[in-house]
From Swiss-Prot:
One of its GO terms (biological process) is DNA transposition. It comes from the Bacteria. This is Insertion element IS110 uncharacterized 43.6 kDa protein. It holds the Pfam family Transposase_20. Keywords: Transposable element.
Amino acid sequence: MFDTEDVGVFLGLDVGKTAHHGHGLTPAGKKVLDKQLPNSEPRLRAVFDKLAAKFGTVLVIVDQPASIGALPLTVARDAGCKVAYLPGLAMRRIADLYPGEAKTDAKDAAVIADAARTMAHTLRSLELTDEITAELSVLVGFDQDLAAEATRTSNRIRGLLTQFHPSLERVLGPRLDHQAVTWLLERYGSPAALRKAGRRRLVELVRPKAPRMAQRLIDDIFDALDEQTVVVPGTGTLDIVVPSLASSLTAVHEQRRALEAQINALLEAHPLSPVLTSMPGVGVRTAAVLLVTVGDGTSFPTAAHLASYAGLAPTTKSSGTSIHGEHAPRGGNRQLKRAMFLSAFACMNADPASRTYYDRQRARGKTHTQALLRLARQRISVLFAMLRDGTFYESRMPAGVELAA
């Protein structure tokens, strides 16, 4: 639980682009501030200093710690204030307990301040981020934006191919991440253009970019072209749209590769990098996400707290004798949960202990996704211990399991 014993005033901030609404409450619930605060360092600092001089320790609570909430938090820290974060979902649920249906900045700020005063367990601590982690946070966010853009563009290409030539989509769609395929579509975007270029010429053009796949890829393309003899109306527009989309997809992939190199350079400069990357399934991007979301792990008392934060701890539901059991939680840090889920999937071929744990869960009747989530939960306990002790990963087989000779 967040410690609020020495707090003299709880200052809830409903952050905004140009101004924040501040609402200050004493531990007894007396209102001492309720006004707009311009999003500028001098004005924010003046308010923090004035409250600190009169009431002592000031706890500044925001509902959005990143983006527009970054400046007030930085100024508050520099002014000697404590800082905390009230998650948006918790804030909205708490707001429903207050009378009235109006939603205003003033009401939101009051809810944030009162929640901090009366329900300290709902608050999340905000560690002082070092320069490397702060830079990683920005780069990781940008990389995730690029990944979403790549997915959107790929889906658009696959949608067009499915509409006009489904057989061709079945060949090219799953391979759009390969640079040889995007290079090919940049130059030959329609079935007619591919057929006109000819099998032999396409093999020669693609071979430098995909030496082992070139012949098989072109053979699959022409087999798909032969399957469809009719021309769907509008197919000619593919010569215009698909090359443009393929070019955009290539550019996004190049940006992500360049960004990965920058993330890797920052990661190598962080002391926890060797610890994180020693765990199977944790690469550059996953390690960066772990640093951004977990830090050094000191803000979590136990591995169970970290698992709960990640949304990997089972939620118990019980009501009399008719409803009982444990279910996967819907909340948690989705960014961290996704990173742990994907790393659990990636590690199974590299770590015999993880594979054995997964197979054991499947043998107990768990689905593929359920088994991966359980593996991710087990790995987050290992991750917590690694961060706590500063030790590298050691593969250990579950008790009672022997490896084949």
